[in-house]
Amino acid sequence: VIRELIEANESETDASIVILAEDDKEKMDNIIRDNISYFATTRVITRSGVVTNINNLKKVMAENAKSVIIMNSAASWRPESEKTLADALVLKSIMSIIAVCNGDEHPPIVCEIHSDRDRDLAENISNGEVKALNEVSVLSRMIAQLALSRNGLSIVYSDMVGFDGNEFYFYRPDDGWGGNLTFGDSINRFKSSTPMGVHNSKGDIILNPSKEMPIESEDELIIFAEDDSTIFYFEKPVFEPSTSEIPTSIVEPKSHRIALLNWTTKTAIILEKLCSYLPKGSELCVFVSSKLPEMDSSKTTLAEGYPDIEISMNEMDLNDLQSLNEMEPQNFDSILILSPGGTTIEEMDAYVISLLIRIRQILIKNSGAKSGSESRAWPKLITEVMDSENIDIILNSGVEDFMVSNQFVSQIMAQVSEEPMALDVYDDLFQAEGSELYIKPASYYFDFKDAETITVPYGECVQAAKLRNEVILGLQIHADQKSKNDMFGIVLIPDKDEEFTLSLEDGLIALAEDET
């Protein structure tokens, strides 16, 4: 969180982050010094004390803060009793900040709360702005989307939630929109940033609205951009596209067969989200070392709500190579490996990596290929990573998409502290209703005829997506998919005049209603 806020404050001449915690001050200072080497214009000040003590909050002048971030002391994999106590402490901390402000308007507060009930309570506790993040809910919905899109979507999300990449901003020109502007028109009024949706005067967030939707004078556009300083609105179109038609072949949603390994606090939510996205005829198979009572009740509930999707709960020794082989991993479209929890982050990642190695060994043996690109029998492997230092090991295990869980949550919290409405955008983005992010084949947008490649300006890609009632945020270049230095082939919001040579294997990153 500190690292993200330092990045966000780079345009400030003198910024400060004040940390109040019960830890020893010297210990906190050492941890910060050991892990962060670049502070730019930001001063980091630590103070040891009880976070709910009003005198301590007055000493750090909490009432004058630009925003307040309240960290939850219990990790999502800890026992329920521990999480309940930690949530109560967060609620008490919110009340203490309100008290410091004497009931007047307080700074925006962003906090992490495990219980949905307590989350609702936190957000309605005062007249001020309180945004409560449920780590399990956010990550579960994100993981479910990774299973349904082409490889690389996690890289897009990583870029979106971090201040060192691209973010979304709420933008309205000082002198207004100039009248008679539709959302479709607005897309070509920005050169190297892209409108994703509208924040209207009623407070509604609408992602990928109808291209005919008029932009009212008080509306803000939700702009995906590298920085707010790079957002420039032009009164006239910056690009005149020539694309007037797109391929007309109808793409039907295809059924998926997805395996989920381990039952965690996220599994039930991931299952529910997958059911809400998947077409009929799809199959979801959960594999665990030891079945839990809630698994069958979850299956029963989902079967009633989604009778056209087959759901199974299977018990097997996930540490045994023979048992994993009987699972026939090569016959799944996607395999989600969830981190079951543990004493330390290193222990949790070690478990996931060892399981990945076993699955990879089976896939190589059964498909006769060394990587997924060499065989159609190689499913998409998706996993959680707790420590970003382990990413390279994970990638060498054959993983196509990964999520650094702790990092994602920290980055979102930092982003919401800078722009509270960002959480509303994420909530909308991760719902089955409306539009979500997908990476779709270039052939959905352009007719290649008999050509292996076509060369087009990025603005034509934007226009082709517009004709499909979509918004695109960038491209995926297949040739660079294995290159970490090239963001695994992901190119986000290039200039509309920049030309790209696209092949049938390349993709467009689209904000769309479904995967077709």
Regions found by a protein language model. Name each.
Residues 1-516:
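Cytosolic regulatory regions of ion transport systems
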